[in-house]
Amino acid sequence: MLLTWLHHPILNSRIKLLSVRYLSLTAYMLLAICPIAVRLLELEDYDKRCRCNNQILLNTLPVGTELLKPIAASESCNRQEVLAILKDKGTKCLNPNAQAVRRHINRLFFRLVLDEEQRIYDVVSTNIEFGAWPVPTAYKAFLWKYAKKLNYHYFRLRW
């Protein structure tokens, strides 16, 4: 059997890959399988990329927020992100520079606590560390100033 491809005679009948029918079948299989393989590889790499690329960043916490998840900047995503996990298992992207978001995350680092024995307010560190979030020294200074003001009013009224 003499196969021809591009007007060149091929004498070996066992080489069927060069026939037009098998080439078109091979091309079809590659075109069908390659996008599926690329899609699977993209899904594996999903956690390493930015999650809030094409979403609107909210400046306040949405209603039904269960927890906040700060995400550090990394090699594949060069910006800091904050995800709000909702009670209905949905997620929303928050603006990490918004005042309301920063206030809620800063509350995780330091607390203003009333010492019952001495009856004074004190700022306590919770010793939580996020790689995505620097320890807010300005918020700690604000809490110390507020505690000092509360202690002053308490002791002034007591005497």
Curated annotation (Swiss-Prot):
Alphabetic keyword roster: Disulfide bond
Which CDD domains does this UniProt record tie to the protein?
Answer: Chemokine_CXC
Its gene name is UL147
The answer on whether this UniProt entry bears the keyword Disulfide bond reads: yes
Example of a GO MF term: chemokine activity
The lineage is: Viruses, Duplodnaviria, Heunggongvirae, Peploviricota, Herviviricetes
**Domain of life, source organism:** Viruses
What GO biological process terms are annotated to this protein in UniProt?
defense response; immune response
Name this protein carries in UniProt? Putative viral CXC chemokine 2
Q: Where are the transmembrane segments?
A: none
Q: Which family does it belong to?
A: Belongs to the intercrine alpha (chemokine CxC) family.
- Coiled-coil positions: none
Which organism encodes this protein? Answer: Human cytomegalovirus (strain Merlin)
Taken from the UniProt record, the cysteine pairs bridged by disulfide bonds within this chain are 50-77, 52-93
Q: Show the GO cellular component annotation of the record.
A: extracellular region
